[in-house]
Amino acid sequence: MWTPGGPPGSAGWDRRRLGARLRAAFAGLQELQGLRATQQERVRGALALQPPPAPAAPCGPHGLHGPEQQLEAALAALQEQLSRLRQQDIGLKTHLDQLDLQISKLQLDVGTASGEALDSDSRPSSGFYEMSDGGSCSLSTSCASVCSDHISPSLGSLLPVAQAHKARPSMGDWRPRSVDETTVPAWRPQATEEGARPPGSVEDAGQPWGTFWPRPVSTGDLDRALPADTGLQKASADAELLGLLCQGVDIPLHVPDPKYRQDLVSQGGREVYPYPSPLHAVALQSPLFVLTKETPQRGGPSFPRESPRGPAGLNTIQTGPVLEAGPARARAYIDRLLHLWGRETPAKGSEGEQGPLRHAASPSPQRQGGWSTDGGGRLLVFAPGREDEGGPAQSRGAGRGGPQQQGYMPLEGPQQSGSLPEEGSKPSNSCVLRETMVQASPSSKAQQTPSAQDYGRGNIISPSRMLDKSPSPASGHFAHPSFAASLKMGPPKSKAEKIKRSPMDKVLRFARQPLLLLDRPEGAHAAPQPSLEWDPAHWPTGRGGLQRRPALAWEAPGRSCSESTLYPMPVLVPLAVAPQESHRTSAQALFPFEASLLTSVARRKHRRWQSTVEISARARLASCPESNLGPPRPVARRAGGPLARGRPSLVRQDAYTRSDSEPSKHSAECDPRFPSVIPETSEGESSDHTTNRFGDRESSSSDEEGGAQSRDCDLALGYVAAGHAELAWTQEAPVSSGPLLSPVPKLCRIKASKALKKKIRRFQPTALKVMTMV
């Protein structure tokens, strides 16, 4: 309540704080005195009423006896109340006195022995406390002048005169000497005359205040105000002294600041103390209470310094919010976010019930991801706690009305292809993918939501898991059922889950950020989500061809971390590929969701190692080369989205062949190891060749091919945040490895930095032979 006002400062602020606190204490004492006076008046009134019954005694002894007892009881109660008030008053004064002593000790480090002059000169001459006669105004000296001269005396004077005499026999002696000792002499006569008058009382007008009170060094107006405060208590007792005490003082001290005459509220807003009450008087001295409402009086003419900052600021800031209900606050915050992001209209999408609901929930997630509404919506599914809100569906709906609608409907190849090329449509496609996955089957919808939640929360569900969860893939959507089957295979899922738990967590981290990439055309592919791609149910009809393609696309982008590193904004090869093929279109629809992941990953330092998704996708391709997956997945080359588009078919073919032969082997071989190793290490290490099939791939395939694939893997990995890729990869690798993969080689070679090397060894030291790359 006594928050000081004025500009911040060290010593100055302390003085202001002390002054504000003293003023609050003074106001509290005045309030207590007023309460005591009113109580005394009541008692006197009750006593005055008592005589009238006496004359009525002849009236009737019994009648008189009853009223007398009542009056006596009332009088006794009043006397008890009065005694309590007096005790409270005494306790308050004692408390103030103790506070005064504590302040003087803590801030001034001054001995409180009243009989001897304080050894201010004997303090350590550290320069900070040094008291030189040269007039240096150190913090300690200024504080001493304020605190010792005025604070203690003022508080002492607040006590009864007799008590003040006992407590402080000599004001001049009690006060510590300070730099401006030249102003002290005025006090010495007071000390000599202490027997004649109370220490706090002021001499007659013969000794004007101005001679000694204005302390040129540091006191300021506080010094002028405090003398008046000193006399205030006595002034209330002796009205004649008030005039003398207030001489030369510009503040009407007998009138407390109006701000102290208002109800107080604790900062928690739970307790309210009405103005005229003992608790209010005590609360005035506590900074834990604020005025219930701002008042222009707050500043008060008497303390202009305090007014600007006084309780008013506290009132506005603390009382309002403090009293505001939690739910109301949350709603207001959400509304504010919605307005900031212009997403107040979740009805954009034709998602129906989910659209608006998710949109309402998505504003903050969208913000976090930095996505457009559609992108945010999609990632909302993965963002922790977002799914519950229905953020993904909503975001998608909000972001792109048309695409979102598609999202709920099975995605069709043409629609996706048309929308995918467009940046905006990509997010919508990704949203659609997400929604389509949800829509593919009610069960898959519910399941996918959990999976998304898992992603967002760090509990990543392997792609295979997701596939299992969403048993009803839009088989019509998949160009290659075999690929879908491989994706669905449960055994890889379980294996991948076991192996890649930690990588998944990392993936989750990345997955939370990928939203940003959706906005970019490349982003559509960039965030291949194992869940979407791997979940046939999630793939829309348009996606059918992309089933494998998405996996391949993921692999290609994810292969080279350097690629993703080079392209902070993931170049979405899948998007480029999607325009070429109808399944690619669907893949793009799939990729937009993945693109979101890619973008987040790209921001995070795109994963530099092949993600498990990439590896698993390759393994799948190898295992299902016979199935008509469409053109080999394009390797995401540094060329970017456009180049990737041109290459996709070739790259995919190449990838297929490679994945069928060596890549698949490595994916299968490394699946168990890499899921844990690569995802974790991918963050730190970046190398164009690092992900190239981990060296084996490079050797098995042409350098260029390996590099391209590595770049693709890098993009996919970076975009997917390696998290989704890892999940999908572990699951997929076992599946694809079963049919076409050669037995897992006992030795897997990886080009890695020392840090990565350590991480790999920590997981499977004997299984991997690591080549350190400078």
From Swiss-Prot:
Please give the Gene Ontology molecular function terms for this protein.
beta-catenin binding; delta-catenin binding; protein kinase A binding; protein kinase C binding; transcription factor binding
Return the Low complexity bias intervals: 637-648
Q: Basic and acidic residues composition bias: which ranges?
A: 655-672, 686-700
Is the Flavoprotein keyword given for this protein?
Answer: no
Q: Name one GO biological process term.
A: negative regulation of cell adhesion
Question: Compositionally biased, Polar residues: which spans?
Answer: 438-452
Which GO terms of the cellular component aspect does the record hold? cytoplasm
Q: Which residues are in coiled coils?
A: 67-93
Record's keyword annotation contains Lipid biosynthesis: no
Region named Disordered: 188-225, 295-319, 345-500, 624-710
- Motif range for PDZ-binding? 771-774
What keywords tag this UniProt record? Coiled coil
Role? Involved in regulation of intracellular signaling pathways during development. Negatively regulates the Nodal signaling pathway, possibly by promoting the lysosomal degradation of Nodal receptors, such as TGFBR1. May be involved in control of the morphogenetic behavior of kidney ureteric bud cells by keeping cells epithelial and restraining their mesenchymal character. May play an inhibitory role in the re-epithelialization of skin wounds by attenuating TGF-beta signaling.
The record's note on quaternary structure and interaction partners says: Can form homodimers and heterodimers with DACT1 or DACT3. Interacts with CSNK1D, PKA catalytic subunit, PKC-type kinase, CSNK2B, DVL1, DVL2, DVL3, VANGL1, VANGL2, TGFBR1, CTNNB1, CTNND2, CTNND1, LEF1, TCF7, TCF7L1 and HDAC1.
What UniProt notes about the protein's domains is:
The C-terminal PDZ-binding motif may mediate interaction with the PDZ domains of DSH (Dishevelled) family proteins.
Q: Which family does it belong to?
A: Belongs to the dapper family.
Q: What is this protein called?
A: Dapper homolog 2
Organism of provenance: Homo sapiens
Cite the source lineage: Eukaryota, Metazoa, Chordata, Craniata, Vertebrata
